Curated annotation (Swiss-Prot):
Substrates-to-products reaction catalysed: Hg + NADP(+) + H(+) = Hg(2+) + NADPH
Activity control mechanisms: Uses NADPH as the preferred electron donor, but shows slight activity with NADH as well. Inhibited by Cu(2+), Cd(2+), Zn(2+) and Co(2+), with Cu(2+) showing the strongest inhibition. Enzyme activity is enhanced by b-mercaptoethanol and NaCl up to concentrations of 500 uM and 100 mM respectively, followed by inhibition at higher concentrations.
Gene that this sequence comes from: merA
InterPro entries tied to this protein: FAD/NAD-bd_sf, FAD/NAD-binding_dom, FAD/NAD-linked_Rdtase_dimer_sf, HMA_dom, HMA_dom_sf, Mercury_reductase_MerA, Pyr_nuc-diS_OxRdtase, Pyr_nucl-diS_OxRdtase_dimer
Family to which the UniProt record says this protein belongs: Belongs to the class-I pyridine nucleotide-disulfide oxidoreductase family.
Binding annotation for NAD(+): G256, S257, G258, Y259, I260, G261, M262, E263, G346
Pfam hit, one: Pyr_redox_dim
Miscellaneous comment: The active site is a redox-active disulfide bond.
Name of this chain's protein: Mercuric reductase
Details of cofactor binding: Binds 1 FAD per subunit.
Binding site for a metal cation: C13, C16
Function recorded in the entry: Resistance to Hg(2+) in bacteria appears to be governed by a specialized system which includes mercuric reductase. MerA protein is responsible for volatilizing mercury as Hg(0). Catalyzes reduction of Hg(2+) to elemental Hg, which is volatile and can diffuse out of cells passively. Plays a pivotal role in mercury resistance and cell protection.
Length: 546
């Protein structure tokens, strides 16, 4: 692939950007980033496609292609101001942009270094692409198996290549709107290249040395691989490459059944693959309350997904296009065959190329960057945020940390990063959403715990939806009845959990929930019903009574 930048006249809005991107896609261009504000487009072309075809495509789309140049690894060095930066950020995801925007608002001079595609994991290869495809999977799943008598629905063949193309367009649009366009909007420097520390206050990028008063490392994480014999010789998939497939595999084996493995496994099950989820643990979602694990497992089995738990992985091998996973389960040896193998066993921090030792930045046993409550590393001038620290790996946590760190590094404040109340959502069907303490965690912290467990078939919204596999669980302090944790398996659980987060964050009690009106026939009503369950038999209550 060769990367090019072309100046374009005639673009006046985001719609124009889409027209240009569509024209370039038709000739085979990849990783297209266009900006009407800058009047340019950056894209990659395979070696066998002449760059003149890009100029022709732009002209035929009724825009005027101007100067075009091949982008080298040194493309931004000329733009670098030799003066010191107030804040130099390594990475360009949610933490990086949150930090940069706030730093600009403080009046700081900001530079951002990115070695790959701007936008980080979430918009490019994580949340956005997976969730839009999950929605497509839900639609085809319902069309094949809807719960209503009298609705004769069916699903045609899935054109995965078209779905992937549509997904890629959405990713490009959001990357431009939420990231690329903001660089000009806030007027900070984007420096393309790989950063490496040379001392405690200097990095080297493309041969140029840059210094700053403060640094933020926000380089994220990438898929990690388990130690399984033969894996290095396999044509395996990761969460990134799976979402680039153009053909649905007949059989897909997933090693790892955390949130990534479950989401992507269920996605391809809905699209038509035979799915086997495999894990070492005896219990699905072992860090969650047992009622949550049981509900999710029941739902997956009902949908026809194969679960292999308590597996000891002996080896993997490939014969032609067939992948085989050899495991021992309950003393018996099994061989799982499939056409594709997805490895989804966690993520590792992107720290290897940073030369952190030169800057005096300490890392943990998994090479994650260690930080204190204020986001500082062992070098007080260098901060870190987001997945690179192996904290809660959510885009909203990264953005929050980036903002707090800028308040401290640039604003001179002493704000602590508070991750005591972090909602988490797994976008399976049904959705899993949790916030606060599990029952076991609450007991470990010394609470005398009282819980309520409400099966989903007691929630009117689930009943009318005819989808009643799931549960609401509330964990409370038995003495004060303050809500300590909320755990949900249901449709739209992710939309309900924000209300639960407020309850946990602000110390609301069970009584606060029961005395607050809840709209009938919403899934959020399940919160109130679960609260009522602490001292009432909700099966003996009329609708909305309490």
């Amino acid at each position: 692939m060769n990367k090019f930048k072309v100046n374009i006249s005639g673009m006046t809005c985001t719609g124009c950007e889409k027209h240009v991107e569509s024209a370039l896609e038709k000739i085979g261009a990849k990783n297209i980033e266009s900006s009407y504000r800058r009047g340019e487009a950056v894209f990659e072309l395979p070696d066998d496609i002449e760059v003149e075809s890009a100029i022709k495509a732009i002209d035929e789309a009724n825009y005027q292609a101007g100067e075009i140049e091949e982008v080298s690894s040194l493309e931004n060095v000329a733009l670098i101001n030799e003066d010191n930066y107030d804040l130099l950020i390594i990475g360009s995801g949610a933490a990086a942009f949150s930090s940069a925007i706030k730093a600009i608002e403080y009046g700081a001079k900001v530079g951002m270094i990115e070695r790959g595609t701007v936008g980080g994991t979430c918009v490019n290869i994580g949340c956005v692409p997976s969730k839009t495809l999950l929605r497509a999977g839900e639609i085809i799943h319902l069309s094949k198996d809807n719960p209503f008598i009298g609705l004769q629905t069916s699903a045609g063949e899935v054109d995965l290549a078209s779905l992937i193309t549509q997904k890629d367009k959405l990713v490009s649009e959001l990357r431009n709107q939420k990231y690329m366009d903001l660089i000009d909007e806030y007027n900070f420097d984007l420096i393309k290249g790989e950063a490496k520390f040379v001392d405690a206050s200097t990095v080297e990028v493309n041969g140029a040395k840059l210094s700053a008063k403060r640094f933020l490392i926000a380089t994220g994480a990438s898929p990690s691989l388990p130690q399984i014999s033969g894996l290095e010789k396999m044509d395996y998939l990761t969460s990134t490459t799976l979402l680039e497939l153009k053909k649905i595999p007949k059989r897909l084996t997933v090693i790892g059944s955390g949130y990534i493995g479950m989401e992507l496994g269920q996605l391809f099950h809905h699209l038509g693959s035979e799915i086997t989820l495999m894990q070492r643990s005896e219990r699905l979602l072992k860090e969650y309350d047992p009622e949550i694990s049981e509900s999710v497992e029941k739902a997956l089995i009902e949908q026809g997904i194969n679960l292999v738990k308590g597996a000891t992985f002996e080896r993997v091998e490939q014969s032609g296009e067939i992948k085989r996973v050899y495991v021992t389960v309950n003393g018996s040896r099994e061989v799982i065959e499939s056409d594709q193998l997805l490895v989804a066993t966690g993520r590792k921090p992107n720290t290897d190329s940073l030369n952190l030792s030169a800057a005096g930045v300490e890392t943990g046993k998994n090479n994650e960057i260690l930080i204190n409550d204020f986001g500082q590393t062992s070098n007080e001038k260098i901060y870190a945020a987001g997945d690179v620290t192996l904290g809660p790996q959510f885009v909203y946590v990264a953005a929050y940390e980036g903002g707090i760190i800028t308040d401290n590094a640039i604003g001179g404040l002493n704000k602590k990063i508070d991750l005591s109340v972090v909602p988490a959502v797994t976008f399976t069907n049904p959705t899993v959403a949790t916030v606060g303490l599990t029952e076991e965690q609450a007991k470990e912290k010394g609470y005398d715990v009282k819980t309520s467990v409400l099966p989903l078939d007691a929630v009117p919204r689930a009943i009318v939806n005819r989808e009643t596999t799931g549960v609401f669980k509330l964990v409370a302090d038995a003495e004060t009845l303050k809500v300590l944790g909320v755990h949900i398996v249901s449709e739209n659980a992710g939309d309900v959990i924000y209300a639960a987060s407020l309850a946990v964050k602000f110390g609301l009690t069970v009584e606060d929930l029961t005395e607050t009106l809840a709209p009938y026939l919403t899934m959020a009503e399940g919160l109130k019903l679960a609260a009522l369950t602490f001292d009432k038999d909700i099966w003996k209550l009329s609708c909305c009574a309490g």
